[in-house]
Structures are given as structure tokens and as C-alpha cells.
Amino acid sequence: MSRSNELLQGTLDLLILKVLTPGPMHGLAIADRVRQLSEDVLRVNQSALYPALHRLEHQAWVKAEWGESENNRRAKFYSLTRAGHARLKTEEKSWERLSSAVHGVLRSV
């Protein structure tokens, strides 16, 4: 496992919630968007993505609905709920605090 994948496991929920902010997406599109926005640094495997989506759905932070993908295939589309938007704000604040703390250590040593 690469270091970027190790980091990804600790931030996957945050990344999924953030990527879903503009609107509903199916699983493959979520993974592609994370890869695209991270300029190919972060790659989300299906074996990590779908359990995370189910966990987020169980927490009522995302909801899933069946629809048709851009290639006319049936796919489950995930979207943020009101609770998901609130959770995203909380997660973003936590991430900012953590990344600021790490940056502080890296600058000082």
C-alpha cells in the first residue's frame, strides 16, 4: 500500500462528502473525481469506496437512488443529505485543524 493510500483511508469519508457537494454521482464517478481533483495522487479502490458509501448511507449522511448513468446503464447515485452537509462542515474543520498542526510540526523541526 502506498503512503497516499494510507492517508486516503483516514480521509475517505471527507473526500466522498466533498465530492458529492455539487450533486448526485455514481460510485465510479466519485472515484474518478477524487483521482482527477487530486491530479492522480489519490486513487479510490472499489473495495474501499463501496463500504464507505454504505457506512455514510447508514449514518444518513448520503442517500442512494437508482438511476441511469451517462452510458445508459443502471447505477446507484449517491447524494448528500442535510445531515451530510452538516457533517462535511464538521469534517472540514477537523481536517483543517489536523493539517495545520502537522504543518506546524513540519515547519519547526
Task: Identify the meaning behind each predicted range.
Residues 1-2, 109:
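Absolute protein N-terminus
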Residues 2-6, 66-67:
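Short beta-strand/turn micro-motifs at beta-sheet edges
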Residues 5-48:
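N-terminal helix-turn-helix DNA-binding core of bacterial DNA-binding proteins
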Residues 49-56:
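Basic amphipathic alpha-helical segments that dock to polyanions
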Residues 57-74, 79:
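Beta-hairpin "wing" of winged helix-turn-helix
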Residues 80-84:
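Accessory beta->alpha helical hairpin/"wing" motif in late/C-terminal subdomains of nucleic-acid enzymes
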Residues 85-109:
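Amphipathic alpha-helical dimerization/coiled-coil segments
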